[in-house]
């Protein structure tokens, strides 16, 4: 069954750990950063460290193996069905530009007020979706045939529910995501589709410009 932290979302001050090596390695990294900060870079000295934890990011440029979007793109490009190993697993999906904006906001705040912004920070979406939701959106945006369930009986353990609580970033930095799942997947599909004939650098520049305009529009709407 899901723990209370999983249901409400993992916070920055929750105990570190993990059932599987992958999540345990994330916790170990945070513990190492925290100990280094306390030992050598206390905020009162004017220099310190903050760590950032993003949700499950998607976006163009990822070609790694055993990752959801790249595996699906490779299959769709070959005319196959998009594979889903754990369609019911819930993750905090977000476009890669969302946490990157948060990292820049955190870096700026840390530079001006080290003591106020040291520590760990979560940058996750306001809503979570299943693997199946993401794959179905991708198939629709890519104009492909469909998806298929491809279970791996010998696969390592993975948590079925992962949620991030980003209240701290929202309240102290004014950060929040501006893209919903559909728009995030659409941008991702568009990047992979266009790289067949266009420069990846050109697509990234155009995507970034579009994202900046979306952020500005969102900010203007909140002022009304």
Language-model-derived ranges and their functions:
Residues 11, 39, 76-224:
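C-terminal substrate-binding subdomain of Rossmann-fold SDR/epimerase-dehydratase oxidoreductases
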Residues 57-59, 99:
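Conserved sequence/active-site signature of Rossmann-fold short-chain dehydrogenase/reductase
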Residues 27-34, 73, 101, 132:
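Conserved active-site helix of classical SDR/Rossmann-fold NAD(P)-dependent CH-OH oxidoreductases
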Residues 1-3, 61, 130-131, 158:
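A short beta-to-alpha transition loop/helix N-cap that caps and shapes the active-site region
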Residues 45-51, 58, 108, 116-121:
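Glycine-rich, flexible loop segments associated with nucleotide phosphate handling
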Residues 65-70:
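Amphipathic alpha-helical segments in well-structured domains
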Residues 1-56, 63-64:
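Catalytic helix-loop patch of NAD(P)-dependent Rossmann-fold dehydrogenases
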């Amino acid at each position: 069954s899901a723990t209370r932290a999983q249901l409400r979302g993992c916070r920055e001050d929750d105990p570190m750990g993990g059932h599987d090596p992958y999540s345990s390695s994330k916790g170990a990294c945070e513990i190492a950063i925290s100990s280094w900060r306390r030992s050598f870079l206390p905020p009162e000295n004017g220099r310190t460290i903050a760590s950032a934890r993003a949700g499950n990011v998607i976006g163009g440029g990822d070609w790694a193996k055993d990752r959801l979007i790249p595996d699906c793109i490779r299959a769709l490009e070959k005319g196959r069905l998009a594979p889903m190993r754990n369609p019911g697993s819930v993750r905090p999906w977000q476009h890669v530009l969302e946490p990157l904006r948060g990292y820049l906001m955190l870096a700026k705040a840390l530079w001006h007020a080290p003591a106020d912004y040291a520590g760990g920070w979560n940058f996750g979406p306001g809503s979570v979706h299943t693997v199946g939701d993401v794959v179905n959106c991708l198939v629709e945006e890519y104009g492909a045939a469909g998806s298929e369930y491809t279970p791996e009986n010998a696969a390592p353990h993975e948590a079925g529910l992962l949620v991030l609580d980003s209240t701290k970033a929202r309240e102290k930095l004014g950060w929040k995501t501006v893209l919903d799942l559909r728009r995030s997947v659409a941008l991702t599909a568009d990047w992979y589709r266009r790289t067949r004939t266009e420069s990846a650098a050109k697509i990234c520049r155009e995507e970034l410009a579009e994202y900046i305009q979306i952020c500005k529009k969102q900010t203007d709407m909140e002022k009304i």
